[in-house]
Amino acid sequence: MTRVSSVSASCTTTNPPKNTREDMSRVGAHLTIQNDFRHLIMQITEKIFTKSSLGSMKFEELKIIHMGCQTVFMRGILTLLTRECFWNTGNDDIRILNRNIPTSYWLEIHTLLEKFIPTTDPWIFSDVYAENTLQYLQKQNACVRLYQEYMLSKLGLYVPLPDFLREDVNILFHLGTVTQHRLFKTFMIFQKYWGIDSYEPIVRTIVRKTWFFFLILWGQLRVDSNVFCEQDFGHEAGILSYLQSDYLSFMGIGQIDISINKSSFPDVFSITDIKPLM
C-alpha cells in the first residue's frame, strides 16, 4: 500500500449547505446522498468495502481517505477534551482529576518536560514548591507546549485547541484521561501503521468505520430522523454499523470480510482491541 504523508486536517469546518430533495438521491432505507459528490463518494466507498487491499486504490483516493479519517479522529478527540473540561470545571482535587490516568502517562509528560524546560526532579515533584511549579508552567505556557509535544509523539500531529482549552490549567489532566479512550488508541494505531503493507488489514478495518462516519460528519450522507425513532434488531451492533449495513444492502455491495488473527498483531492489540470495529 502506498504510504501517504500525514495531512493536517483542520477541526474547524463550515456547516454543510442545506439541500432540497432534488439535490439528494436515496442510497439506503435511511440514507440520502448529495448528487454533486455522489459519483466520487460512491466510487471510493465501494472500493473500501470490495477491494482486497487499500493498496490497489489510487494515490488521490488514499489521500482523501486519510484526510477524512484524520478529521473524524481529531474532531472526536476535541469533543472528548471538551467533555473532560466541562466535567472538571472548578475542580482542583488532584485525586479526582487523576482518577483515570495511569502513572506511565505522567512519566512520559515528565520526559517531554525535561526536553524544553530545565528542571530537577526534587523541584518538580515537591509538594512545598507545587504552587511555584504551576505558576512557572503557566508563565512558560508549558501546559500547551507539553500537550502539543505529547500529541506529536503519539500521533504525529496535534489537535488545535480552542481558547477555553488552551487557558485551562487542567488541560494535561484532560489529555491524560482522553489517552485512555479507545478512540485515541485507535487513532494511534491508524497513524502508526498507515501505509505499512503487513498491517493493511488492521488499517482497512479502521478505515471502513471511520470513512463512513466522515461522510455523515461532512454532510454528504444524510441520515433520516426516523432511524432514531424505530427499533430494529440491527441496532444491537451500533447505529453506525446499522447505517453502514443499510447502505451496502441498498446499493447491492458485497463487502470482502477481513480476517484478523489477534496473535498475528500482538503490538496492535496491546494498544487496544479493534475487533469491535469489525
UniProtKB/Swiss-Prot annotation:
Biased composition range(s): Polar residues: 1-18
Residues crossing the lipid bilayer are: none
Q: Give the span(s) annotated as Disordered.
A: 1-25
InterPro entries recorded: Herpes_UL79
Describe the family membership recorded for this protein in Swiss-Prot or TrEMBL. Belongs to the herpesviridae UL79 family.
What's this protein's name?
Protein U52
